Regions:
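N-terminal small-residue-enriched
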Residues: 1-444
């Protein structure tokens, strides 16, 4: 590993003032099973570092995968050359740190003792259980396992010296079912660093039952319907629109929430939380990509917008404190802004009670086309969808080949009820099930 002090000394000698090093090490495993054979297998250890430094008032950047002292001359010269060619500075600053950082339990060493063979045997068992459940299961078209450990170190010349280690694990499987020439597919995740949660029989049963429930799907007539959005669908839509809360998007006029702090932007029953300390959260961390201590915040409270999400740079522009939402997707990336674990606050209302409230409408369990069918700035969307009829307060026939259309900002205002079934899926952004007063539906 590169000697941080030697790097900083070389930087000072070359004319750099403030400097920062960000090191990431990843140890990842993945495998996939198909027809009881290992279809793919990968185990890798990668590491890299990014370095930035202030030269003549401008912040230069570089990165490398060569993390030893022999790379120091390259790192220093690259940062200086990068700073020289910058036409202007965005007044970036390095952070000196906070007095207190919350200690989080993000690393679970027991999981790393699980052998590759145990994971492969689990996948084979899932595949076997799926086929054993129903003769209409024609294929387990995806059955995979992934886990890994990530270590981050962040140190600068202003006294910041932070590190954090966390691990993750998840599996995903999907099945294809066939009846009378009709094909349907569905899948599900298990996300946990406790291997006892990986139970093949119950996992397979959930996947197969969901796929079989879609057989015999019908179209519905075009019109305007009360809509119940499945929790994962609502979370996916929120994730696709999450940049609207970024201070950077506000400054670039890429969000309709500009100048809306303190104003009503959603139904009074809606609160949106960003919680970096959530247990088992995919985005949990005690510090952000710039070393700012993270904390839980309500972005929206009872429909009112409280705050944007900020890095050091945007916080300075808005003359507010940073929110701990600076992010780096990898050691190669520059500092951006993103949520940690963001979600719509659940209530005590059960899923069955939501159905009772709606009485008659549509339950949307899947949408397609979020990248092409949703405008992340205007909020307009038109998405292919499938799900179930809601009739007399109960789930009825499956439906497919429909399109739901509307606007995200209008949707926030039309939320009539919120469930208790908060789910993130394989993401850091989640939601409970949402009852939307009405959406336009194109069918037959």
């Amino acid at each position: 590993m590169i000697n941080f002090n030697t790097l900083f000394e070389a930087g000072h000698a070359a004319g750099l003032t403030d400097m920062e090093i960000y090191v990431v090490k990843n140890d990842n495993f993945s495998c996939k099973v198909f027809e009881q054979n290992v279809d793919s297998y990968s185990a890798s250890v990668t590491q890299g570092l990014s370095f930035r430094g202030l030269y003549e008032g401008k912040m230069g950047y570089t990165y490398t995968e060569k993390c030893d002292d022999s790379s120091i001359p390259f790192i220093i010269s690259s940062v200086i050359n990068n700073a020289i060619i910058l036409e202007k500075s965005e007044n970036e600053e390095l952070y000196g740190g906070d007095e207190f950082y919350t200690t989080l339990d993000l690393y679970h060493p027991a999981f790393n003792e699980i052998t590759p063979l145990e994971k492969i045997n689990f996948l084979k068992a899932v595949e076997s259980e799926c086929f054993a459940l129903d003769p209409r299961v024609k294929s387990v078209n995806y059955c995979a396992f992934s886990n890994g450990t990530s270590e981050i170190m962040l140190k600068n010349t202003k006294g910041l010296d932070l590190s954090e280690r966390q691990n993750f694990a998840y599996t995903y499987a999907s099945v294809l079912v066939t009846e009378n020439g009709e094909n349907k597919t569905d899948g599900d995740f298990i996300i946990s660093t406790n291997f006892t949660d990986y139970e093949p029989k119950s996992f397979a049963k959930k996947i197969v039952s969901r796929a079989l429930a879609q057989l015999g799907a019908k179209k519905v007539k075009s019109g305007t319907y009360p809509i119940l959005l499945r929790n994962l669908v609502a979370g996916d839509i929120l994730e696709a629109m999450s940049d609207i809360f970024s201070g950077e998007a506000i400054l670039k006029d890429l969000s309709r929430l500009k100048d809306k702090i303190g104003m009503v932007i959603a139904s009074p029953i809606v609160s949106i939380i960003d919680d970096p300390h959530l247990e088992n959260g995919m985005g949990s961390s005690s510090f952000d990509g710039e070393g700012v201590a993270t904390y839980t915040k309500e972005i929206v409270t009872n429909g009112v917008l409280n705050t944007y999400l900020h890095s050091l740079t945007t916080a300075k522009t808005f003359n507010v404190a940073p929110t701990g939402n600076a992010s780096r997707s990898s050691f190669k990336s520059s500092v951006n802004i993103s949520p940690t674990n963001m979600y719509i606050k659940p209530t005590q209302t059960s899923f069955d009670h939501l159905l009772t409230i709606i009485q008659n409408g549509l339950y949307i369990t899947d949408v397609q086309g979020l990248h092409s069918g949703l405008n992340g700035i205007s909020g307009d969307f038109s998405l292919s969808a499938s799900g179930f009829l809601i009739k007399d307060g109960k789930l009825d026939d499956p439906i497919h080949e429909i399109t739901i259309a509307g606007n995200f900002f209008d949707l926030l205002q039309q939320i009539e009820a919120i469930g208790n079934d908060l789910d993130f899926g394989p993401s850091n952004i989640g939601s409970p099930s949402l009852y939307i007063k009405s959406l336009k539906v194109a069918g037959e």
